[in-house]
């Protein structure tokens, strides 16, 4: 059977929160089959466990924020994206603040951390959410949509009227049957505009933001000396975010995702719409890994590249 996965050993790292600018300690721990991804605020007098789920996402203005019993864990999307990309089903994520550290602004640090811990298959079938009917959410000209598809592919279109973004492409389509998440998506960094960063800082946000963890643009160009990691890094980062946003549903999706100018809020609304229609999806497992869609049965020791 195609099995669930967790990590082999405990791994730790330290970083800063993008918005708070505060130091955050992050610990990843193995979890039993069927646990899911569970975030734990270990800094609180009584630690609060917040399982990743579509219904636990609260604030989505600047990041995906999980909330429960007054506790929050913000900016979960890059770590969730890494878990999706490496097929991690079960994991405990201990944090000492209300924000996951931003690291280098991409998912690469989390991929490296998970691969350093080692990936372990578990004796339980991996459960997928197979989309059986189209589901769509619209907000003005923005939209996000899931269609039935035997695998996982995404098509994302952004619309940033900026010369540097225009030059690198505003649209990307990826089918993970023949694309490596680690090589092609994981290293794409978050980006922002210098004037917005200044405004956010005045509001007490983006205190941890810098060119070490984001691509920063002025009105005309990229300000980072080292340029881009991918020719189309902007749209690739939006896709990285979407993969993480969608993975909070609790299982990998078997679906085709199409989006135009979507963000954390629309992605979460799409998941809620899907879950509201019981005839739009089913939970499936694969007794024979060979019968599963290509791309899900990759080697657990994929080299970081």
UniProtKB/Swiss-Prot annotation:
It catalyses: a UDP-3-O-[(3R)-3-hydroxyacyl]-N-acetyl-alpha-D-glucosamine + H2O = a UDP-3-O-[(3R)-3-hydroxyacyl]-alpha-D-glucosamine + acetate. GO terms for biological process: lipid A biosynthetic process. Its EC number is 3.5.1.108. Belongs to the LpxC family. Keywords: Hydrolase, Lipid A biosynthesis, Lipid biosynthesis, Lipid metabolism, Metal-binding, Zinc. The keyword Repeat does not apply. Pathway: Glycolipid biosynthesis; lipid IV(A) biosynthesis; lipid IV(A) from (3R)-3-hydroxytetradecanoyl-[acyl-carrier-protein] and UDP-N-acetyl-alpha-D-glucosamine: step 2/6. GO terms for cellular component: membrane. The active site is at residue 264. One of its GO terms (molecular function) is UDP-3-O-acyl-N-acetylglucosamine deacetylase activity. Zn(2+) binds at residues 78, 237, 241. Catalyzes the hydrolysis of UDP-3-O-myristoyl-N-acetylglucosamine to form UDP-3-O-myristoylglucosamine and acetate, the committed step in lipid A biosynthesis. Its cofactor is Zn(2+). This is UDP-3-O-acyl-N-acetylglucosamine deacetylase. The gene is lpxC. It is an enzyme of class 3 (hydrolase). InterPro entries: Ribosomal_Su5_D2-typ_SF, UDP-acyl_GlcNac_deAcase, UDP-acyl_GlcNac_deAcase_C, UDP-acyl_N-AcGlcN_deAcase_N. SUPFAM superfamilies: Ribosomal protein S5 domain 2-like. The lineage of its organism: Bacteria, Pseudomonadati, Pseudomonadota, Betaproteobacteria, Burkholderiales. The keyword Chaperone does not apply.
């Amino acid at each position: 059977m195609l099995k669930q996965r967790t990590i082999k050993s405990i791994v730790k790292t330290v970083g800063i929160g993008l918005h708070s600018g505060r130091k955050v300690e992050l610990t990843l721990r193995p979890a039993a089959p069927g646990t899911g991804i569970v975030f734990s605020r270990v800094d609180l007098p009584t630690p609060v466990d917040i399982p990743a789920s579509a219904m636990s996402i609260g604030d989505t203005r600047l990041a995906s924020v999980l909330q429960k019993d007054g506790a929050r864990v913000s900016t979960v999307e890059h770590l969730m994206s890494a878990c999706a990309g490496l097929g991690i089903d079960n994991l405990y994520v201990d944090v000492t603040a209300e924000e996951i550290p931003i690291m280098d602004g991409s998912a690469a640090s989390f991929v490296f951390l998970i691969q350093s811990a080692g990936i372990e298959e578990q004796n339980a079938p991996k459960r997928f959410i197979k989309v059986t009917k189209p589901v769509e959410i619209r907000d003005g000209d923005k939209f996000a949509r899931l269609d039935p598809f035997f695998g996982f592919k995404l098509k994302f279109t952004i619309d940033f009227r900026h010369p540097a973004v225009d030059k690198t492409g505003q649209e990307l389509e990826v089918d993970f049957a023949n694309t490596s998440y680690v090589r092609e998506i994981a290293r794409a960094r978050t980006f922002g505009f210098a004037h917005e960063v200044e405004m956010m800082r005045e509001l007490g946000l983006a205190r941890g933001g810098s060119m070490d963890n984001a691509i920063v643009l002025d009105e005309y160009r990229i300000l980072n000396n080292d340029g881009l990691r991918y020719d189309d890094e902007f749209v690739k980062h939006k896709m990285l975010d979407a993969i993480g946003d969608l993975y909070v549903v609790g299982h990998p999706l078997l679906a085709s995702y199409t989006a135009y100018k979507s963000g954390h809020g629309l992605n979460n609304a799409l998941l809620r719409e899907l879950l509201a229609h019981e005839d739009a999806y089913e939970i499936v497992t694969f007794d024979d890994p060979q019968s599963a869609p290509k791309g899900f049965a990759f080697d657990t020791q994929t080299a970081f590249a």
